């Protein structure tokens, strides 16, 4: 849960799309949890969306059948719309996603339709599975997920969340393809914790606050290069590094979005979010 006031929509997790023997299968959140979350959302004056994710077999059925199953779940569950998040789609699913989202637009009518797309990559892998213009034409919002950046130099892990270079390049790449009012930037509200060069956990704001409170063993920093906060804790022979978005980092990303005319930011979770991060978005 969390404070949802000021949010346009809240996505209720628990939906999962898959295909077995050509048949579309859709798991949805249980009724008790759904009703509790919908009630909280409406009390805050925000829309409640059904959040649906899926793996590599999510779009192997017919697009019309997939869209029909998703739209029916939205209707049956009394949701205000759908948030479809199919991460790192293979290139051969491009047409299926475009067709499914177009069919969803028709079936959902006035209900909200949010779709996540991997941002065009500046470094490394480029995702060509997303027809950004076509998806944005059908969806109310195209939510961009920016790839994390990870490297180790001299034993120190550099792993900023939603790196600014990547954010800039993604928005610059899409500015002539997708109307700014259709875009939203996804920000990770949890941190990224590393030990001995390996990612070990995703601490929430409370856990990060605990580490910062250990002033004897913890130093906090802000990387202007990546516009991201990080802390280093050295205790009992171990070194732990946590990268996270604080007020300054959130504000930098909000300003970058504003520069490109993008007026919405999507938070990965309100359970893990810090007041600092929220302040940076105001």
Residue ranges, per PLM feature:
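Short, acidic/polar
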Residues: 1-6, 60-76, 124-134, 245-258
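Substrate-binding surface in catalytic domains of secreted glycosidases
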Residues: 20-29, 91-213
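Active-site groove signature of glycoside hydrolases
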Residues: 14, 67-96, 141-155, 266
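Glycan-binding loop/region signatures in secreted carbohydrate-active enzymes
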Residues: 182-253
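Hydrophobic faces of well-ordered beta-strands that scaffold small-molecule active sites
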Residues: 8-12, 46-52, 82-84, 113-117, ...
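Extracellular low-complexity, Gly/Ser/Thr-rich intrinsically disordered linkers
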Residues: 234-282
């Amino acid at each position: 849960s969390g404070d949802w006031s000021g949010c346009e929509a809240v996505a209720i997790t628990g939906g999962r799309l898959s295909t077995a023997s050509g048949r579309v299968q859709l798991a949805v959140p249980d009724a008790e949890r759904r009703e509790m979350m919908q009630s909280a959302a409406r009390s805050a004056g925000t829309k409640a969306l059904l959040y649906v994710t899926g793996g590599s077999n999510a779009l192997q059925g017919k697009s019309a059948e997939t869209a029909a199953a998703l739209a029916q779940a939205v209707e049956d569950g009394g949701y205000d719309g759908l948030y479809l998040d199919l991460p790192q789609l293979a290139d051969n699913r491009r047409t299926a996603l475009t067709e499914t989202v177009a069919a969803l637009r028709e079936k959902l009518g006035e209900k909200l339709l949010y779709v996540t797309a991997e941002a065009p990559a500046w470094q490394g892998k480029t995702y060509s599975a997303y027809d950004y213009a076509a998806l944005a034409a059908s969806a109310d919002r195209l939510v961009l997920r920016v790839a994390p950046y990870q490297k180790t130099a001299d034993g120190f892990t550099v792993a900023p969340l939603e790196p600014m270079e990547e954010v800039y390049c993604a928005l610059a790449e899409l500015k002539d393809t997708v109307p700014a009012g259709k875009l939203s930037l996804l920000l990770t509200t949890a941190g990224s914790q590393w030990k001995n060069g390996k990612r070990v956990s995703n601490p929430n704001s409370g856990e990060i606050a605990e580490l910062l409170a250990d002033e004897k063993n913890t130093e906090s920093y802000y990387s202007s290069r990546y516009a991201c906060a990080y802390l280093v804790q050295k205790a009992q022979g171990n070194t732990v590094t946590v990268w996270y978005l604080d007020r300054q980092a959130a504000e930098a990303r909000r300003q970058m979005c504003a520069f490109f005319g993008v007026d919405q930011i999507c938070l990965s979770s309100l359970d893990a979010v810090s007041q600092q991060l929220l302040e940076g978005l105001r």
